[in-house]
């Protein structure tokens, strides 16, 4: 049985003696001494590394489970077998089995060279003993020299792995964009605290200076508001704002604060200024990193949006594996699953919405623009992820992203022209200055007054709620009464209406009063006779029940008397 071992010297194949069996539980005892190790194993063949570069290349391939050309030739010469070109030819049967430490490499050797291999947990004690007595097994090699070679090869292998790590730059971008978001939150919190704190002393200043960083710099330079007249703000503010600030400081209605209060406010202003300066440096660092790792994506959607996409996907390679439809809604997963659950429309964009190409599109065309930008972004990401590092550092590295951006801008103008929509992009005048700028806030001091005349509600007929109803309503009621009387008189002229419980209404025409009275009396007599007959029958039933009840009561009374006696 042969044993393949990779060392810092090279690849070594040992011959395992017949006395030392690999399935023996006491195999480790054979390697307690150098003599026992040399008795159990003999060097069959050795292939030394020619240089450190070749050693790093071969060991990296072995760790990945790949078979290099040099190792393949060495095994064919030492063990035998057949390579891909000689598999069809007859070869002598290989009786020796090769022991390999890595199961993945063992499968590759068996498949490529048709060599029977063994790689399982039973070989661990064997390789542990080989590493322990390696210097004596190789013969003529000093242990110190072997340790030095192992250390140098380990350093070279580590540098090689770090150099070709595909995620190392991605990690820097992910951490940078996360820190940038945290700094924005911190600056906002500290700046709001400065405005609230200093607002007790100079409340009008918050409306005059809107920018947080400029506010902190002005507070740091001015101190108390009484120093505003003698302080030079030419390096911090324009002339009109400086004049407004000084005039407002003279008429301010803020309270007075102590020197210790101003000291703490100044220290907080220093924090705001220092964090903002570091944020500027971090933003420049992120821009340079994105230009180096993904120049085409940066040219298409910008460094911030590109960095957020990479951070959300985990790495540039993971982002390159996503289709354009996933890139389009990346970051809107919660809205997507909620829409699928409720069977509503799915979102049209996610993080890519903040790209300038989508932001300058009209609201009606944002969805279509997001789809086109995602398509071109997916192509740019794949170009950046799969291109060489040298080509990404070239001047023309962002050519794909720039050309796609130009195409998308022209396509957006064409869509706006077809839809008849005016462009919402920034208008630039002939002298290069931006048109339609937002006007600056000015404190006019004019307050609006309340118009009480708008509270009047006009009523019909100009009547107050307390006035009585009009004569038209009274006339309407009188007409209803007259109609009612008229209907009654018509009924009386036509004849009386008789009500019968068993029959419908009937009118007897030509009947005199005496006949009508006699008919009514006859009806009453018939009803009385019927009622008397019913009562007589019920009376007999009731009398029987009464007698039965009385008999029961008498019996109960007798029983009670007997018990009492």
Curated annotation (Swiss-Prot):
Compositional bias per record (Basic and acidic residues), positions renumbered to this chain: 471-481, 531-541
Occurrences of domain Nop (ranges): 293-417
Keywords in alphabetical order: Nucleus, Ribonucleoprotein, Ribosome biogenesis, rRNA processing
UniProt-listed PROSITE patterns: NOP (PS51358)
Xref: Pfam families: Nop, NOP5NT
Primary location recorded for the protein, binned into one broad class: nucleus
A cellular component term, taken from the record's GO annotations: small-subunit processome
Superkingdom of source: Eukaryota
Compositional bias segments (type: Basic residues): 519-530
A GO biological-process term: rRNA processing
Classification via SUPFAM superfamilies: Nop domain (SSF89124)
Family assignment from sequence similarity: Belongs to the NOP5/NOP56 family.
Function: Required for pre-18S rRNA processing. May bind microtubules.
Name under which the protein is recorded: Nucleolar protein 58
């Amino acid at each position: 049985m042969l044993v393949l071992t990779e060392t810092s010297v090279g690849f070594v194949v040992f011959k395992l003696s017949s006395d030392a069996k690999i399935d023996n539980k006491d195999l480790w005892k054979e390697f307690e001494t150098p003599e026992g190790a040399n008795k159990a194993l003999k060097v069959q063949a050795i292939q030394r590394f020619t240089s450190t570069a070749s050693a790093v290349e071969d060991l990296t391939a072995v760790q990945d489970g790949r078979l290099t050309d040099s190792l393949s030739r060495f095994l064919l010469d030492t063990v035998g077998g057949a390579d891909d070109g000689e598999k069809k030819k007859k070869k002598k049967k290989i009786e020796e089995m090769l022991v390999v430490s890595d199961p993945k490499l063992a499968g590759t050797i068996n498949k490529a060279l048709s060599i029977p291999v063994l790689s399982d947990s039973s070989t661990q004690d064997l390789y542990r003993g080989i590493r322990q007595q390696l210097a004596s097994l190789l013969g003529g090699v000093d242990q110190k020299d072997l340790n030095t070679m192992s250390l140098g090869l380990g350093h070279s292998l580590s540098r090689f792995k770090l150099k070709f790590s595909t995620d190392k730059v991605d990690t820097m971008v992910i951490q940078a964009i996360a820190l940038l978001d945290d700094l924005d939150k911190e600056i906002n919190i500290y700046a709001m605290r400065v405005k609230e704190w200093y607002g007790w002393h100079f409340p009008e200043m918050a409306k005059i200076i809107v920018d947080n960083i400029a506010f902190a710099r002005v507070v740091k330079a001015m101190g108390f508001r009484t120093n505003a007249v003698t302080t030079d703000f030419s390096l911090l503010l324009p002339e009109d704002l400086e004049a407004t600030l000084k005039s407002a400081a003279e008429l301010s209605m803020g309270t007075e604060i102590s020197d210790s209060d101003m000291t703490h406010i100044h220290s907080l202003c220093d924090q705001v200024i220092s964090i903002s300066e570091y944020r500027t440096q971090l933003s420049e660092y992120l821009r340079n990193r994105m230009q180096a790792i993904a120049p085409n994506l940066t040219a298409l959607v910008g460094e911030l949006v590109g960095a957020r996409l990479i951070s959300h996907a985990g790495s540039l390679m993971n982002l390159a594996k996503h289709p354009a439809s996933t890139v389009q809604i990346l970051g809107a997963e919660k809205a997507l699953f909620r829409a699928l659950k409720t069977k509503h429309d799915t979102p049209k964009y996610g993080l890519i919405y903040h790209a300038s190409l989508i932001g300058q599109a009209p609201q009606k065309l944002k969805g279509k623009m997001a789809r086109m930008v995602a398509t071109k972004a997916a192509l740019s990401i794949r170009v950046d992820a799969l291109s060489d590092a040298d080509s990404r550092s070239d001047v023309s590295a962002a050519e794909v992203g720039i050309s796609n951006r130009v195409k998308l801008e022209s396509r957006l103008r064409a869509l706006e022209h077809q839809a008849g929509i005016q462009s919402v992009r920034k208008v630039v005048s002939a002298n290069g200055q931006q048109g339609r700028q937002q006007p600056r806030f000015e404190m006019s001091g004019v307050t609006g007054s309340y118009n009480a005349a708008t509270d009047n509600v006009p009523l019909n007929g100009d009547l107050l709620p307390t006035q009585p109803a009009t004569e038209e309503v009274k006339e309407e009621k009188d007409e209803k009464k007259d109609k009612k009387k008229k209907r009654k008189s018509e009924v009386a002229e036509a004849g009386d209406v008789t009500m019968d419980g068993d029959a419908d209404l009937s009118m007897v025409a030509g009947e005199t009063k005496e006949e009508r009275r006699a008919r009514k009396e006859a009806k009453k007599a018939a009803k009385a006779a019927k009622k008397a007959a019913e009562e007589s029958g019920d009376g007999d039933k009731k009398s029987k029940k009464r007698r039965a009840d009385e008999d029961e009561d008498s019996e109960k009374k007798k029983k009670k008397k007997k018990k009492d006696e």
